[in-house]
Structures are given as C-alpha cells and as structure tokens.
A protein has these predicted regions:
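Periplasmic polypeptide-binding modules associated with outer-membrane biogenesis and secretion
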Residues: 1-164
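Short loop/turn motifs that connect adjacent beta-strands in outer-membrane beta-barrel proteins
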Residues: 167-173
C-alpha cells in the first residue's frame, strides 16, 4: 500500500488485539477502506483478500491498481513525449481518476487536438494494474497567408507567410 500508510489502514479496521472477529463487522470495515480509496479518486484500488495467520493476526491485502504505462494513440504529427509530458498521473503510481482528468485537460489545452479520450487497458504485468491509452484527434496546426497589393510608388508587392503551431511535432512554433 502506497496511498495510505499501514497505520492509517489499521485505524480504518478499528480491531483491537484480542477482539473476537465478526465477519459482518470486518466486511463493513473493508467497505470503508474501499470507499476511502474511491472517494480520493483511486477507483481501481480495493481490498483483494483477508486472512488470519497462525498467530491470529488479521492480514488485509489491498490492490491499488498501478499504472503500468501511458501510451499515446492517434497522433500522427505530435510526438509521444509532447503528450505524455502533460500527464500529472505518472507510471508506477496508483491510478487516480482526478489526476487522469487533469492530464486530459492539459493535453487538450495544448491546442493541437480536436478530441482527447482515455482508454483503460488491463495491465500486462498484473491484470489488477492498468495501461492508459490516450487517444487524440489532431487538427491542422499550419497556416499560410498570401497577400498582394499595388501602389504607384512601390508597384506590385506581395506577402507570403507560413505558420506552424506544432513545428516538427514538438509543440514549438
């Protein structure tokens, strides 16, 4: 467990040494742990199992739903690192819906995409983990301006201007 310390989780359980275990009471405490994770945005985290060892110690196994990878998809021009650098949700950390939502907003706010969506794929190392696929639909970021004019003093004159908001896919102008 990385989100909550063992001490915090022990307080959630509120079971004293020597106390007789009641399965309904333990079930309610487990629901409380799951609810706390969900409330704080860790929607993949859950109690995966409980056991009592030979010494009568209660062990609670928690799966936190770790992000194994963040994979950009649909980007033809924009480089992967331009998209992934905007992610506040990090690989190797528990999945948090609030961080993912903020990450999607940051990618969209780059101004290079018409649409940004997230797909969650099962982890390859552990099915309780997740791979985040960030699917983008790029829009045109280049502009060209042509202009012409004529004056008696200068004669015919013209202007050609090229602009690119996502130069070489790096996010540079």
């Amino acid at each position: 467990n990385t989100v909550y310390t063992s001490e915090v989780l022990t307080k959630f359980m509120d079971i004293q040494p020597g106390q007789v275990l009641n399965s309904v009471y333990v079930g309610q405490k487990i629901q409380g742990i799951n609810a706390a994770y969900a409330r704080d945005g860790y929607m993949l985290a859950h109690v995966d199992g409980i056991r009592v060892d030979d010494q009568g110690m209660l062990h609670v196994h928690i799966v936190e739903g770790i992000v194994e990878d963040i994979i950009p998809a649909g980007n033809k021009k924009t480089r992967d690192k331009v998209i992934t650098r905007e992610f506040v949700q990090k690989k190797g950390k528990p999945f948090n819906k609030f961080l993912v939502r903020r990450s999607v907003e940051r990618v969209y706010n780059l101004g290079f995409f018409d649409d940004v969506n997230v797909r969650m794929l099962p982890g390859e190392q552990d099915p309780n983990n997740v791979i985040i696929e960030i699917d983008v639909l790029e829009h045109k970021t280049g502009t060209i301006t042509l202009g012409a004019g004529y004056s008696k003093s200068d004669g015919l004159m013209g202007i050609i201007e090229f602009g690119e908001e996502n130069f070489r896919g790096t996010g540079d102008k």
